[in-house]
Amino acid sequence: DTVWDHAQQLLSWDVQQSYQLGIQWPEPATLHAVGNCLLEFSPSNAYVEDWRQLSHTGPLLGLRLYQVQHLDNGEVFAMDGGLIVAGAHIAYAQSRLPQIQDKLSDFSRLDQALAQHVINEVEIESYEVSVALNGHKIQYSTQSQRVGESIQLTGFELNDQGIITQIRQIHGEDYLCYFQLDLYQPE
């Protein structure tokens, strides 16, 4: 999750699950807008990032994945990830199932868990991050077999409580994925 500290004007991240087994962004950031550019500075000055976003047309949509339900046995698991549509570009991310991620709790690096046969490569790669540029065909993915396939954009449903769901296959089994609309609305 992105965490905004309004009092200190700092942006930080609360990451529960990620592909690697560590905090990728341990330091908060200050943000400065200059025209259509957003500059991110670390308080220690260890890095500066230039988030230059040129104006373009097309949809901008984020769906945040927060849980899945196994359709055969009804078990519900917390998950992380989501679908991002930014104009002609699409990205999908999905964390590992908890029973896989839990195997990694005693490790700081994936290669250590792999070397000790606690987890295999298929389980490591079950954390999906797939990117499609200028269309729906995946060009980059942590799951190499997904390259060339389409990101699944069909089958979304909105129930009476306003919850967005989609049935997806995870490890060859059907899960009902629960999403919430994720967007930023400036004040």
Placement of each model-derived feature along the sequence:
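Lipid interaction determinants
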Residues: D1, Q9-E187
